[in-house]
UniProtKB/Swiss-Prot annotation:
Biological source species: Vesicomyosocius okutanii subsp. Calyptogena okutanii (strain HA)
InterPro entries for this protein: UROD/MetE-like_sf, Uroporphyrinogen_deCO2ase_HemE, Uroporphyrinogen_deCOase
Localization in the cell: Cytoplasm
Function: Catalyzes the decarboxylation of four acetate groups of uroporphyrinogen-III to yield coproporphyrinogen-III.
One GO molecular-function entry: uroporphyrinogen decarboxylase activity
Name recorded for this polypeptide: Uroporphyrinogen decarboxylase
């Protein structure tokens, strides 16, 4: 099968600009909320291959999207490491057993794939359900981002993580190396189970200084790229560091196929900077989806007009879609991208 999304990542010709949306299976869809209610709680939803398949397919059935993304959570790996993941309504993820010191890190196992079999069963179930309609994206969190959750136990302050970074960097590097080993095995098994491409979400890479970003985040993502490509050289891999616009040249040098960008950088500048090396994914501000259809169309045209050429670009938001967006506006977005991308070529 030839898919525009995969071809764009590999810089092969595409029939139109492909689009998928971060968190496209989510709370903004009434059918998702119904399935979530049926599951009882978020973790049960994630850990049921059948229900994960159901919610993965919902946006594919509703919109003319060019890729599906596995419905799961980036914190499946820390959960399998025994940290006791749970979710508080309105507060996000928490861990019952956060990492406090080197002793805790040394106890962590990296051989997790047996405990994550529900994810791989979900991938194969989704792949079968898709029946080659669109490609399937697998994913993981980056080691740095996973470590922040594991050390903080939740929240977005990062005081404990940065305390370890400055006071005991060797301990943090050990944790990041263990996570890297687990992520490589995790993504490779997703590919074996049917994922057509994979993505690494570095949600909190942008909170680091440049040197710390290179040492504590990108260094390990580069190892992941190498570890995935060693086993699956033809499977494209995308890296996305939120607020990482100033690091794009470094990211493009990892050997990845695509880089995700947010709305704090201009697409045309990114294309000039790294477009000769990697495909680019992004970068509409998610808040545009609160606007009128006319404004959505205007903003889509603004983004599309910045990219020159007929491949190497995937339209997406600059971050995940928000839960209170009107699904009708998502349809307008998707249809606009496909219509106007043909005009812009």
């Amino acid at each position: 099968m030839s898919f525009d999304y995969i071809n764009a990542l590999l810089k092969k010709p595409t029939s139109r600009t492909p689009i998928w949306i971060m968190r496209q299976a989510g709370r903004y869809l009434p059918e998702y909320r119904a399935t979530r209610a049926k599951a009882g709680d978020f973790l049960t939803l994630c850990k049921s291959p059948e229900l994960a398949c159901e919610v993965t397919m919902q946006p594919i059935d509703r919109f003319d999207l060019d890729a599906a993304i596995l419905f799961s959570d980036i914190l499946t790996i820390p959960d399998a490491m025994g940290l006791g993941l749970y979710f508080m309504e309105g507060e996000g993820p928490k861990f019952r057993n956060p990492i406090k010191n080197l002793k805790d890190i040394k106890k962590i196992s990296t051989d997790l794939n047996n405990d994550l079999s529900y994810v791989f069963d979900g991938v194969s179930t989704i792949k079968k359900s898709l029946n080659n309609r669109v490609p399937l994206i697998g994913f993981s969190g980056s080691p740095w981002t996973l470590a922040t959750y594991m050390i903080e136990g939740g929240g977005r302050i990062f005081a404990s993580t940065k305390k370890m970074l400055f006071n005991d960097p060797e301990a943090l590097h050990l944790l990041l190396m263990k996570l890297t080993k687990s992520v490589i095995a995790y993504l490779n098994q997703q590919i074996v189970s049917g994922a057509d491409s994979v993505m690494v979400f570095d949600t909190w890479g942008g909170v680091l200084s440049e040197q710390n970003y290179l040492d504590f985040s990108l260094y390990y993502m580069a190892k992941i790229v190498k570890g995935v490509k060693a086993q699956h050289p033809n499977i494209p891999i995308t890296l996305f560091s939120k607020n990482g616009g100033k690091y794009l040249t470094h990211i493009a040098n990892t050997g990845c196929d695509g880089v995700g960008i947010d709305w704090t950088v201009e697409l045309y500048q990114v294309q000039q900077e790294v477009g000769n090396k990697v495909a680019i994914q992004g970068n509409l501000d998610p808040a545009v989806l609160y606007a009128t259809p006319e404004v959505i169309e205007r903003e889509v045209k603004k983004v599309l007009s910045q990219f020159k050429g007929d491949t190497g670009y995937i339209f997406n938001l600059g971050h995940g879609i928000t839960p209170d967006v009107d699904p009708e506006n998502v349809k307008i977005l998707v249809d606009c991208v496909h219509t106007f991308s043909k005009e812009c070529r």
